[in-house]
């Protein structure tokens, strides 16, 4: 997936590690991940937690 900013990464993408991924499946995030930001019915911002 494509990296994305999780809430735990900080307020901005500059200088922060992007620990999330954009996940393009309506079935939810991979095992061990959770959807930290809803982004439409088929895209989720998934974070490890």
From Swiss-Prot:
It comes from the Eukaryota. Disulfide bonds join 4-46, 6-36, 29-47. One of its GO terms (biological process) is regulation of signal transduction. It is found in: Secreted; Nematocyst. The keyword Secreted applies. Keywords: Cardiotoxin, Disulfide bond, Ion channel impairing toxin, Nematocyst, Neurotoxin, Secreted, Toxin, Voltage-gated sodium channel impairing toxin. Its main location: secreted. GO terms for cellular component: extracellular region; nematocyst. InterPro entries: Anenome_toxin (IPR000693), Myo_ane_neurotoxin_sf (IPR023355). Binds specifically to voltage-gated sodium channels (Nav) (site 3), thereby delaying their inactivation during signal transduction. Thus it may strongly stimulate mammalian cardiac muscle contraction. Belongs to the sea anemone sodium channel inhibitory toxin family. Type I subfamily. This is Delta-actitoxin-Axm1h. It comes from Anthopleura xanthogrammica.
